[in-house]
């Protein structure tokens, strides 16, 4: 090779590597910056997805212990004694047999390759499949815009195509976000050298994409000039663990409807789970009855729709929405407050409490918890996706705190107002 050609090649390589997006893509390093991804709500399933697998969507699951997806026939595997194999078996899906950490490698019978147990909570099915490494991708961000693409290696589980049943059309797997070492945000934290912390701003149906930020940092929503939402949260409360489940749990001391305390049968703290698997908040039967009755009393003068029309199932309280009136926080109905450990309120206004089920009918969007015989006692409340929409929710594993902005309509913005235009 001539000296001139060698110098030209060296110069090209140096220039390419000096570009931040090129370095990030090659090294899987976002230079210590958080990553951002768009969140889409699927109209058919009410599930939320992020396009982080070659631009294809994975379903967000706050209770999912693993990231799993369909794999190519040829893929790398991890050995059974690898520490990630142990982490993959930290939580066992329901109905899945305990059959060890792996199986003999077909290509090398003397090698034990690790298997995991991906679980589809929407179909209730699980499988046994290889633990592998996969490249995922998102964009580095300054909290205002995406900056440049970042590709990084993640430990994931393969899954048979049959496990994709009941996922949104086009989804290739599930991005587990639970409190485990193999959850998506934990792997982003390790690979990008950022905080083990993430924020979800879930969109409402038909209102554009929401935003997920992995690794902490600010979040600015349009219009320009608005303050950092992550720095102006309405409240925080401690996160608690459940020894049997890897999801996110907080504690409430009481519930109020229309600023009056709801009388419950227990004086014990109320366990509350946050969950993207269900569309609407589910309440334990005793809590459900007390809350629904209190809401009915507080709306006694409003025009009820009885019996509720078929589209309203499984809701109990439905109203003629033309009679409700409106505010910038949604329908003018009594607010519901969860009074949390530490004293802050998670307040549910009409925008998150009332689901529009037909042109002129809106219903109180809470349901009863579905319990199964032999399963652990359910939480008092499971906050579903609808009640988290247009509300920045911050999950901070390092501080073991949960933060929330409250309904962003009150700030005259929404979760669909992040500027996804790539910064120049």
Swiss-Prot record:
GO MF terms here are: aspartic-type endopeptidase activity; endochitinase activity
- Give start-end of the signal peptide: 1-18
Subcellular compartments: Secreted, Extracellular space, Apoplast
The Peptidase A1 domain sits at 43-405
Please name the PROSITE patterns in this protein's record. PEPTIDASE_A1
Q: Which GO terms describe its biological process?
A: chitin catabolic process; defense response to fungus; polysaccharide catabolic process; proteolysis; root development; shoot system development
Highest taxon listed in the record's lineage: Eukaryota
Principal localization reads secreted
**Residues bearing attached sugar chains per UniProt:** 139, 345, 419
**General function of this protein:** Chitinase that possesses antifungal activity. Inhibits the growth of the fungal pathogen Rhizoctonia solani by degrading the fungal cell wall. Does not possess inhibiting activity against fungal endo-1,4-beta-D-xylanases belonging to glycoside hydrolase family 10 (GH10) and family 11 (GH11). Involved in the regulation of plant growth by regulating the intracellular calcium ion concentration in roots.
* Protein name as catalogued: Chitinase CLP
Please name the gene that encodes this protein.
CLP
